[in-house]
C-alpha cells in the first residue's frame, strides 16, 4: 500500500452526525444479518431478465453495496460488527469469483473495491491479502487484455466497455496504492479519450447508440477513474488526449441536455439491435425522451473534480449519493 494516508475514499467518525451518515448507518445496521451470495461468474451483458443467469447475477451483485455500506458504517462508528461483515463478504467473493474480464458484467465490482479501500485496516490479514491479490488480478488482467487487443482498437475497445475497464483498472490500482499500475491506467485513459471522445466533446457511444443514456454510461466510469487517482497527484479531468479531447469537454457536451436547454429522443437511430429488444421488452429508459435526472450521479462525481459542476448536480439530484457525499475526496 502506498504511504499516502489520504485514501481516495475518506470518511471519519466526525461526520457521523451528518444526516446522510445517520441514514447510511441505519441501513447498514438493518443489513448486519445478511449473508453473502457469491457466484463464480456474473453475466447480465447482452441479456434480458429471466435469460441465462441474469436474475441470479442481479441478486448476487446486491452484495456489493451492502459491503460498501458496512465499510462506511465502520469508518463512521468503528463498530467492529461492520468490519466483520465486510470481511465475511470480501472473503466469500474473492474466494469464489473468477474474473471474466467482461467489464459490463463486472462494473458493479466498483462497490467491492470501495468497501475494501474503506475497511482495509479493519480486515483480518488473510482477507486483506486475498483481496489485494484479487484486485491485482483485476487491474493487471484488464490492462493486459487492452494492450493485447488488435490494433487499431475498435468496437468494444473504444466504446463504453473500455471506459468501464478503465474504471476497474484505476480503482483497483488506487486501492492497492500501486503507482506503476496507476501510470499504466493513465496511459490507457488518454488512449480511450482519443478513441472515444471527439474534439467537440461528443462520444463514440452517442454516434453508435443515438442515446444520451449511453453518454452517461460512458462518462460515469471515466469520471470515477479520475476521482480514484486524485490523491496520487493525478488530475485527469482536463488532461488532453492526442486529438485534443478531454473528459471535461465530454461532460460539457452533455450539459445542455442535462440542464434542459435541449432534449433528445432516445435510440431512434441506434445501430445496435439489442436496444430495440430492450425497448420491446418494456425496460425503462430505452425509448422516449431522455431524463436529465439520470445524469445526477455523473454530475455529482464531476463536482468532486471541479466544484463548478455542483449547481447542476444539485438541480439533477438534491444530494449526492450517500457513499459519494460521505467519502469522495473533498
Task: Walk through the language-model features, giving the residues of each.
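Long, repeat-rich segments with strong aromatic
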Residues: 175-176, 180-265
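Amphipathic alpha-helical repeat scaffolds
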Residues: 71-72, 167, 171
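Extracellular glycan-targeting catalytic surfaces
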Residues: 1-152, 163, 230-231, 239-330
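Alpha-helix capping and helix-loop boundary segments enriched in small/acidic/polar residues
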Residues: 103, 156-160, 213
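A short glycine/serine-rich beta->alpha loop
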Residues: 98-99, 155, 208-209
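Extended amphipathic alpha-helical interaction segments
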Residues: 134-147, 151-165, 172-174, 179, ...
Amino acid at each position: 500500500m502506498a504511504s499516502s494516508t489520504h485514501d481516495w475514499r475518506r470518511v471519519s467518525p466526525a461526520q457521523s452526525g451528518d444526516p446522510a451518515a445517520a441514514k447510511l448507518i441505519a441501513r447498514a445496521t438493518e443489513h448486519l444479518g445478511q449473508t453473502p451470495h457469491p457466484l463464480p461468474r456474473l453475466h447480465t451483458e447482452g441479456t434480458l431478465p429471466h435469460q441465462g443467469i441474469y436474475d441470479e447475477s442481479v441478486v448476487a451483485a446486491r452484495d456489493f453495496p451492502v459491503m460498501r455500506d458496512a465499510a462506511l458504517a465502520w469508518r463512521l462508528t468503528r463498530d467492529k460488527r461492520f468490519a466483520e461483515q465486510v470481511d465475511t463478504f470480501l472473503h466469500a467473493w474473492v474466494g469464489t469469483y473468477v474474473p471474466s474480464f467482461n467489464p459490463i458484467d463486472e462494473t458493479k465490482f466498483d462497490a467491492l473495491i470501495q468497501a475494501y479501500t474503506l475497511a482495509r485496516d479493519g480486515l483480518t490479514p488473510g482477507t486483506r491479502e486475498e483481496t489485494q491479490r484479487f484486485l491485482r488480478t483485476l487491474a493487471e488482467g484488464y490492462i493486459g487484455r487492452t494492450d493485447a487487443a488488435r490494433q487499431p482498437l475498435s468496437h468494444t475497445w473504444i466504446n463504453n466497455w473500455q471506459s468501464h475497464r478503465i474504471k476497474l483498472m484505476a480503482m483497483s490500482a488506487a486501492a492497492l496504492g500501486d503507482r506503476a499500475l496507476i501510470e499504466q491506467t493513465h496511459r490507457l485513459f488518454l488512449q480511450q479519450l482519443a478513441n472515444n471522445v471527439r474534439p467537440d466533446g461528443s462520444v463514440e457511444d452517442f454516434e453508435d447508440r443515438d442515446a444520451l443514456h449511453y453518454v452517461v454510461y460512458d462518462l460515469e466510469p471515466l469520471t470515477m477513474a479520475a476521482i480514484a487517482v486524485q490523491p496520487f497527484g493525478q488530475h485527469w479531468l482536463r488532461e488532453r488526449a492526442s486529438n485534443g479531447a478531454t473528459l471535461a469537454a465530454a461532460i460539457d457536451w452533455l450539459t445542455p441536455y442535462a440542464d434542459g436547454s435541449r432534449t433528445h429522443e432516445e435510440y431512434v437511430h441506434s445501430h445496435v439491435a439489442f436496444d430495440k429488444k430492450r425497448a420491446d421488452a418494456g425496460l425503462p429508459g430505452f425509448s422516449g425522451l431522455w431524463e436529465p435526472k439520470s445524469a445526477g450521479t455523473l454530475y455529482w462525481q464531476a463536482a468532486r473534480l471541479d466544484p463548478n459542476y455542483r449547481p447542476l448536480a444539485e438541480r439533477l439530484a438534491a444530494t449526492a449519493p450517500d457513499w459519494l457525499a460521505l467519502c469522495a475526496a473533498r
